[in-house]
A protein has these predicted regions:
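Long amphipathic alpha-helical tracts in eukaryotic proteins
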Residues: 1-92
Length: 92
């Protein structure tokens, strides 16, 4: 079980690194989507993403030129700020 969590957190760090370094719209929207799914499905997902200091970058992407990046960033911020059950209700 430890090995599985270690792998998950390595992938999560990679996603946050891509989020901070990439300028490609498709990459940014996929990273926001992946982080929002992690926040929604992991019991401590919000706190882990906040500890990785990804919130500021995600919030800055809400002003991106690409509408898909803005949409995914907004959904991710909703899940960061709200509990998972309320965020999933707003998404549908």
């Amino acid at each position: 079980m430890f090995c599985l969590y270690y792998f998950i957190f390595q992938v999560l760090r990679l996603v946050v690194t891509l989020l901070n370094t990439s300028n490609d719209a498709k990459t940014l929207s996929i990273c926001c989507y992946d982080l929002s799914q992690f926040i929604q499905n992991h019991p401590s997902g919000r706190m882990i993403v906040l500890d990785l200091k990804a919130k500021g970058r995600i919030m800055s992407l809400m002003e991106h030129d690409n509408p898909e990046v803005r949409r995914e960033a907004l959904l991710c911020v909703q899940k960061l700020l709200l509990r998972a059950k309320y965020a999933s209700y707003l998404q549908s």
